[in-house]
Amino acid sequence: MADDKGGRSRRPGSALAVDLRRARRARRDAQKVSVIPPVPVTHGPTIDCADREPIACVREWFASEGWKPFPFQEEVWTAYLSGESGLIHAATGTGKTYAAWMGPVMEWLRDYPAPRPAGDQLRRRAAAPPLRVLWITPLRALAADTEAALRAPIEDLGLPWTVESRTGDTEPKVRARQSKRLPTTLVTTPESLSLLLTWTDTPALFEHLELVVVDEWHELMSSKRGVQTELALARLRQWRPQLRTWGLSATLGNLDTARDTLLGVGPDRHSRPGRIIRGLVPKGLQIDSLIPETMERFPWSGQIGLRLLPEVIQAIEEGKTSL
């Protein structure tokens, strides 16, 4: 035990624990200031989709980003366009978001092939289609990143859609606007969705809904928030019987149970049909060891981990995604 200036005992590593709390607080503050403003498309399309197959436009957009669609992504797009629902099971960082997102994008390009040019933001918002896609995320911190990822292709492909989020962090003026007209795509949490469903005019707001995506389904399943999500989905299916539902997950054991829980039961009290699409994308494994620069003391009681805590925090912050 060590003594501080006041003579009280202090446990080893307490200073590092303080550093950890400060680092967490700094990350939370950074997330608050990095919220992306919910504005519609502000520039014209960079990819001309006139007289072209939607899949060709989407592949060109992927190529413009330096990517190539994985087979499992195209399998999901085909299933969605066929009216199917299901569960996407793929490792973190393999493209589950665009696997679920490009289906409704291609559907719009197929049904409404003429892109609309960019214009005044207010006029574009007024001309945007009503709510078509509902994206449920378990964490408010993911809403801003998800919103940015969804907005990127619709801007480049010329879709007249709006993408906004509605969470506990949403500004009051945005909430007020959404109470009159929801965006074409809404990113929200189970709690915010449950409140949204209590509005008197909710059935009218959701009358054009085509798709619900439940992100990180493993985080919600078998929890109170998961039950909350299931109840919300059941309510939406009463209004929209043909509603398509897709779940995204990277870590699930029993995929059949996860899919059946997500899709619920139909009027016949049997499980709704749905696909399970696996993203078997090979990923390389690289192991880096964090070793103290100096070894003047080498405690065997586990305190070496606390000594390396700042290095671990730095490694986590440098990574794009961390588990």
Where are these regions (language model features)?
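SF2 helicase catalytic motif II
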Residues: 191-194, 200-240, 245
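Conserved pre-motif I regulatory segment
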Residues: 40-89
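Conserved helix-turn-beta segment of the N-terminal RecA-like "Helicase ATP-binding" lobe
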Residues: 142-165, 260-268
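Conserved interdomain linker/interface between the two RecA-like ATPase lobes of SF2 helicase motors
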Residues: 234, 244-261, 266-323
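Conserved motor-coupling elements within RecA-like helicase/translocase cores
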Residues: 169-186
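Conserved strand-helix element at the start of the C-terminal RecA-like helicase core
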Residues: 132-146, 247, 315-323
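Motif I (Walker A/P-loop) of helicase-class P-loop NTPases
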Residues: 97-107, 227-232
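Conserved SF1/SF2 helicase motif Ia
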Residues: 106-145, 239-242
